[in-house]
């Protein structure tokens, strides 16, 4: 059912120039960055087919009219992806979606937590208990509950866990402020001029 519902939506994704001209429709996504980037994404799709995943929507070789020399690729959709496949293990950085099937909530959680990457994840449910369990135990830096892409606003921290993290701090939010802040700590103590005290050489306490 998921694959049947997703296929027409992926096929309908519009790709073209990142900045449309007057009269042109807005695009869902633009071209990739370089020819090498396009080759990498294309090779991932080919690898997925060779490994046995079911390619439901193939975005390879798609070129918008008037932009045939651009680094374009259409949306692609795989079904029956398994955790031992390259397209599951590695980040593709292209418009390629893979459906991985799990038999239970616990199995799905295990798949996420055993993956080396942990940027963002989401759960869709009407069960508040399952949502709390997911948010508490899932090993990812950004969690969405009935939100498909859990990228927070700039006043929240943005970043992942595990191999999706590149620093002890994330970007945006309080971590972004800390990154650009040089801390200074000043400790002061003013004696009471009406109280005579002997000299003290220990750490002062309040």
What does each model-found stretch correspond to?
Residues 22-28:
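Short linear capping/connector segments at secondary-structure termini
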Residues 14-15, 21, 45, 63-206:
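Conserved C-terminal structural/oligomerization subdomain of aldehyde/semialdehyde dehydrogenase
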């Amino acid at each position: 059912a998921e694959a049947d519902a997703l296929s027409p939506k992926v096929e309908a994704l519009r790709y073209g120039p990142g900045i449309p001209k007057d009269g042109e429709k807005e695009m869902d996504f633009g071209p990739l960055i370089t020819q090498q980037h396009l080759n990498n994404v294309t090779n991932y799709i080919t690898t997925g087919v060779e490994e046995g995943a079911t390619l439901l929507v193939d975005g390879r070789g798609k070129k918008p009219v008037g932009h045939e020399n651009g680094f374009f690729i259409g949306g692609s959709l795989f079904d029956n992806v398994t955790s031992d496949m390259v397209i599951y293990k590695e980040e593709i950085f292209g418009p390629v979606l893979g459906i991985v099937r799990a038999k239970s909530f616990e199995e799905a959680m295990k798949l996420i937590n055993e993956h080396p990457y942990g940027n963002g994840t989401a759960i869709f449910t009407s069960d508040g208990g399952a949502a709390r369990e997911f948010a508490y135990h899932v090993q990812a830096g950004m969690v969405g509950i009935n939100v498909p892409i859990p990228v927070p606003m700039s006043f929240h921290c943005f970043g992942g866990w595990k191999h999706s993290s590149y620093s002890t701090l994330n970007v945006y939010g309080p971590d972004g402020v800390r990154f650009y802040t040089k801390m200074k700590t000043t400790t002061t103590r003013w004696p009471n001029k009406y109280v005579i005290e002997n000299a003290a050489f220990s750490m002062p306490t309040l």
